[in-house]
Amino acid sequence: MSRLTEDSIGDINLASTQMQGRLEEFDEISKEEENMKKRIERLRKFKNIDTNTNHTIGLQNENLENKNKDTSITKPKRRSKRDNNRIKSLTSLMEETYNKGKSFQELKQSKLGQKDAQLSIFQYFSGHKEKIGDILKRIESIEKRKLESSDVPEIEHESRILYTKKEWTDIIKRIRLRFPELSSRTKKSLKYITNKIQIQNQSQLISEYPKNNSSIWSQASAPPDTEFTDDDLKWLYDLTSEQIINESTILQNDLEESDNETPFVMTLSQVMNTTKSEDTIDREFDVISDSSPEPSPIRVSFCCRDEQSDKALHLSEQKIQVKNSIYDPEFNGNEIFSHQKDSVETAVSIESFPFVQSGQRESITGDIAEISEDNFQVSETAPRQPQAIHGTQEAPIEISSSSINRGKTNLMSEEDRASHNEAEEVIISSPIKDSELFKTPTKRTPGSKNIMSSPFRLHCNSSPLSIRSNSVTPRHERIVSEESSAYSTARSKFKLSSAQPIPSQYQFDDSEEEAIFSSMPARQAYKKRKVYHTSRLLIDGGLYVELMNENSKVKIKTIETKRQPVDSENEIRDSEDEGEHDNSLSVIEITREVDDTDDLVNLGRNPRNENDTSVLQVPSSPQIDNSNVLGSLYTSQAADSAFGSEKILEDPIRSNALELTQDEFNNMSTKDLKAKFQEWGLKPVKGKEKMIQILSETNKLVSQSQLNDSQDKPMTASQHTIKTNIYNRISFHLKQDQYWLDKILSFEPINLCMLQEWLASGSAGVKLETDILEKYCDELGITYTDIK
C-alpha cells in the first residue's frame, strides 16, 4: 500500500509543474509559521505580568485569517494621524510627575493627598543645598541672619528651601558682581559658579598665608613662625634689662663716656614682637608725625655749651619727625617757614610744646643740618655768614621731656645758669644747605634786621644722625646780609653782574644798606614785530603804476614780463589779445604792512587762502584805460570837491527833505516805483516793500538839488547824474577808512558782503544792494569777490 502511495505521489510531481510550485509554496508557509511559534515562545519569558494576554491570541487569529484569505490585491490603508506633541500645562506636568497619575481634584478630597501634592510642587521649584550651599552662606551676610546648616531636610520642612524674591535678587547681584564675564549659558550653572568661588577662596587663603605658596619670594617675605620673647632676645644679643625695657641699645652712660663718638643704633624690627601697638607714644619721647613717611626714626642728641665754661651739656635723645605747624598771619621775625604738607593725624598735642617765657630764654648755638636724600651723608663745613630766616610763630617752641630736665640737673650748676643774661631759644630749622640758602631775594621787610639764624647743624658720619655744636652765636649779633632776605627761592645760577637792582618797598634809616640785587636777568624791551602781506596780480596788457611814498605802508612794484610768442599754426589767437599791448603782460606785486589785529584775523579767515603769496589773473577791460588806474583813484580830487562839503546827516534841511521823500515812497503806487527805478538806473526787483527799501537807502546818497535837476533832464542824463552822485558818496566813505583804501590801492579783491555790512554799520549808514556795489567796482576798476 505504501508503495502504491509513493508511486501516486511521484505521479503527481511529474504530472504538472504548476502543482509542484503550489506545493513548494505551502511548504514555505508552514515553515514560517513554525518559526514564528518558536520565537513567540522564546519572548514569553520577557512578558510583563500586567499586560493583557489577549494580544497573543489576536496574533494567532490574524495568522489563521491570513491563511484563509485569497491572494487578492488589496488597497493600502491610510495611516492614522499622529498625535501632536503639545506643551502640557503646569498642573498636568505636576500631576504626571509627582501625583502618580492621580488628578489634583482627587487629591484635594483627602488632607494627606493635598499636602503631598503641594510638597511635590514645592520640591520641584526648590533649590538643592548640596549644590548652592556656598552661595547661601554668602547670602547670610546680606540678610544678617543664619540659616540652618542641616543636610537634606525632612518632607515637612521642605518648603523652607524655597527662596524669596529678595534672596534670588541678592544671589543674582552677587553672581554678576563676582563674575561679570560669564556667558548666558554658564550664568545658570550653579556647579560652575561654585567651582569658581572655591578657586577664589583658595587664592585668598594663599595670599593670607604666603608660606603655603610654593614661590621663593612668598616664603622669604613671610614672618618667622615663632616669635622671640624678651628673655630670648636678652640671651641672644647679650642685652641688659634696661635695654629690653627701653627697646634700644643706646644708654645714657654711653653718651656721657664719649662725647665725640656717635653710638650706633641697632634695630630688631624683624625679630621683635609685633603685638605692641605702634600708635602708642612713650612718655619720655615727644614724637611729631610727618606727612611724608621716612624709612626709620632718627635719633638726635641735642648739645649746647656754656658761654663761660664752654662745658658740653647733653640734653637727651629725641625721636624727631618734623610736622607742619599752623602759623599765625602776624609774625615777629623769630620763626621759620615750613614747606611741608599737612598730615591728617596729629601725633602729639600742643600741650607737649610749652612756650618759653621771655625771662627764661637762653642762647643756644648750632649748625644747619645738611642731609642728602640718597645716602644720608652729612658734610661738616665751616660756619658761614648766618642767613636771615622768617618765622610765623609769636614765640619759639621748646622741646620738653623728662630726660631734658634730668640732664640739666645733672650737668649744669646753678652758678652757670645765673651767668646767662638772656634765655635760651630752641628753633627747629628746615634741612636746607647753608650755601644754597636764599640766593634770590624778592622782598625785604623792616623786621628782617633782628632775625635769628637756625641754631642747629646736623653732623654724623653714619646713620643714625646726631646734632653737634661747634661755636657759640650771641643773640644780639646782627645777621642780616646783602644777599639774603626773608622771602627767597632756591639758589640761582645767574651771575651777579647781569642782575638789576630792585628798589626796596620799605625805607630804612641805615645808610649803609644798599639796594637788593635780583638774580634774574634784565628784561629786554619788547619790539613789535612787523607783519607784511604780499600779493601778486597778473594783468593782461601794459599797466603803468606810479611809485608810492616810502613812508606809506603800501608798496607797489611793477614787474614787466613778455608774453610768450603764440604759435599761429597750432593756436588760435584770442580777440582780446589784439591791441597795443598784445605782446606784454603786467605783474604787480603789492606789499602791505599788517599792524591791526582785525587784519590778521581777516587774513586767517580768508577761505581762498589769499593771505599767502599768490598770483591772481585779472583781465583788462576794453572800455577802460588801464594805463594809470592807480593814479586816477588815488589823486582824484574832483569827486571829493563835489560832495566833500556836504553833510548829509548833520544838515537839518536835508533830513527834512529825506523824511518827505520817505513818505512819498510809501504813498507811491507800484507803477510809480518802477518808473523811479528806471529813472535812477536801478535794477528792478519784485515786491513793493523791497522797492521802497532800496529807494529809501539810495536816496540817502543823493542830494535834493541833484534830484530836482535830474527831473528836467532826459532819462539817460538823469541816470548818469544820480549814478555819479552815488558812486562819489561811496568813494568818499571808503577813502576815510585806511583799511579799505589800502586794499583798493593794492589791487586786493574786496569782499562785497563785508563792504555792504561796513557801509550799513559805519558812518554812511546805508545798506546798498550788491548789484549797486558790483557796478561801482566795475566802473572804477576795483577787484572784488562775492564769496560770503
From Swiss-Prot:
Pfam families in UniProt: Slx4 (PF09494)
Ranges of Basic and acidic residues composition bias in the record: 562-573
GO function terms (MF aspect): 5'-flap endonuclease activity
Superkingdom of origin organism: Eukaryota
Cellular compartments annotated: Nucleus
InterPro entries, per the entry: Slx4_ascomycetes, Structure-sp_endonuc_su_Slx4
GO CC annotations on file: Slx1-Slx4 complex
Stretches for region Disordered: 59-86, 562-584, 599-622
PTM note: Phosphorylated in response to DNA damage.
Record's keyword terms, sorted: DNA damage, DNA recombination, DNA repair, Nucleus, Phosphoprotein
Gene Ontology biological process terms in this record: DNA recombination; DNA repair; DNA replication
Comp. bias (Polar residues): 612-622
Record note on quaternary structure: Forms a heterodimer with SLX1.
Family the entry assigns: Belongs to the SLX4 family.
Free-text function comment from the UniProt entry: Regulatory subunit of the SLX1-SLX4 structure-specific endonuclease that resolves DNA secondary structures generated during DNA repair and recombination. Has endonuclease activity towards branched DNA substrates, introducing single-strand cuts in duplex DNA close to junctions with ss-DNA.
Entry protein name: Structure-specific endonuclease subunit SLX4
Gene name for this UniProt entry: SLX4
